[in-house]
A protein has these predicted regions:
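Conserved beta-strand positions that form and line the central face of beta-propeller blades
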Residues: 42-45, 98, 251, 258, ...
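Residue-level detection of beta-strand scaffold positions
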Residues: 38, 120-122, 187-189, 207, ...
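Extracytoplasmic/secreted envelope proteins and their assembly/folding machinery
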Residues: 40, 256, 264, 268-271, ...
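Short, conserved micro-motifs composed of acidic
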Residues: 1-153, 157, 179, 192-194, ...
Length: 355
């Protein structure tokens, strides 16, 4: 019997149960880097000599719920019981743990399903003689890692859905990165974002021959709700020599060229873009609003552009691929007639100087 589980795709995306002379076993199939599936093999972390079935991998991609027959090898309340395991940081799995009474009974339980927020679970039980569906509030210890659904629609400059594109999700203070494909028919995408550690998240568009563009989502924006990225928040623009593109969310302290931690987080994504596109040469441009002395603004913009260049070099981008220049207040994107517009003019751009 096949049990499809597609949530993340990095760890486990398909589990099956098969019946042989001895009972049921759970099998695992891992997704290869090219998107194809590996051969299903027994998932011996959970399999016993008895019946093991009904696997459910939560959207956190780390917590697996399943059912096992209670035996001396795997004691429980009775009959078929619900268990769970978690994947550890080193890739190993914890020891199976019984979800406990009164969820498990002396009869059989099957098919546990946990809501995306990890708070409510549903399952079938034959307690009392007939199969019925029950729900309960999942206790803290058995809950998966907190996650949220990040979704949006990606369209090009003409308003048409984008095909052959990928959304990259990165976490501040972590090397963990996930990728989801954009639906080429309608431009929609959806990604599971882990929110347990309360980290800011950077969402980046990746499409061959197109510019780097990202959106920073503050950890406070998640909470218990899903997050929708509006179409205008992410641009999909072709790389053109001489064209300028803004790197969003590059922030500095007032009158300072010192990069903030959030700015460094964004620039790590930009560095990945440059390393992946090793033939591109870019010029880093610093811009200010019109508040303050002209010469001081020019010097500040030069220092900020240089600090961006130096940080990119520290991340492994070759220095001979980068130049930096400041323009002060001389090249506003919009009129400096409101605080909102002045904020738009305090920006860092990159210009394609060669490909």
């Amino acid at each position: 019997k096949s049990v499809p589980l597609y949530y993340d795709g990095r760890i486990i995306t398909g589990l099956t149960t098969t019946t042989d002379f001895f009972g049921n076993d759970i099998y695992i199939s891992k997704r290869r880097e090219d998107g194809t599936w590996g051969t299903a093999v027994p998932f011996d972390v959970v399999n016993t000599a008895g019946k093991d079935k009904s696997p459910f991998l939560h959207q956190d991609s780390e917590t697996l719920y399943f059912v096992s027959q209670c035996t001396k090898e795997r004691p429980g309340v009775g009959g078929l019981d619900i268990f769970y395991i978690r994947q550890q940081k080193d890739g190993s799995w914890s020891e199976p743990k019984n979800i406990g009474y009164p969820i498990n009974s002396e009869s059989d339980e099957l098919g546990l399903f946990v809501s995306i927020d990890g708070e409510v679970a549903y399952f079938s039980s034959r307690v009392g003689g007939d199969w019925n569906i029950f729900s309960f509030e999942l206790y803290e210890e058995a809950r998966p890692q907190s996650v949220a659904l990040l979704k949006g629609v990606l369209k090009d400059e003409n308003g048409s859905p984008v095909s052959n594109a990928t959304i990259e999700v990165a976490y501040e203070g972590s090397d963990e990165i996930t990728h989801v494909k954009v639906n080429g028919d309608d431009g929609k995408y959806a990604a599971i974002v882990k929110t347990e550690k309360k980290q800011d998240v950077m969402v980046t568009v990746k499409k061959e021959g197109h510019a780097f563009d990202s959106k920073l989502i503050a950890k406070e924006d998640f909470g218990k709700k899903d997050v929708t990225i509006r179409g205008k928040d992410l641009d999909v623009k072709k790389l053109v020599v001489g064209e300028a593109y803004t790197i969003n969310d590059i922030l500095y302290a007032t009158s300072s060229a010192v990069l903030s931690d959030k700015s460094k987080f964004i620039l790590k994504g930009f560095a990945r873009f440059l390393i992946e596109n090793e033939t591109i040469k870019v010029g880093i441009q610093g811009h200010t609003d019109d508040v303050g002395d002209d010469n001081r603004n020019l010097k500040l913009s030069e220092d900020r552009a240089l600090s961006v260049k130096q940080y990119l070099v520290s991340l492994g981008v070759e220095a001979n691929r980068l130049t930096s220049k400041g323009f002060g207040e001389t090249m506003p994107n919009v009129p400096n007639d409101s605080e909102q517009n002045r904020a738009k003019n305090r920006r860092t751009d990159f210009v394609i100087e060669g490909m």
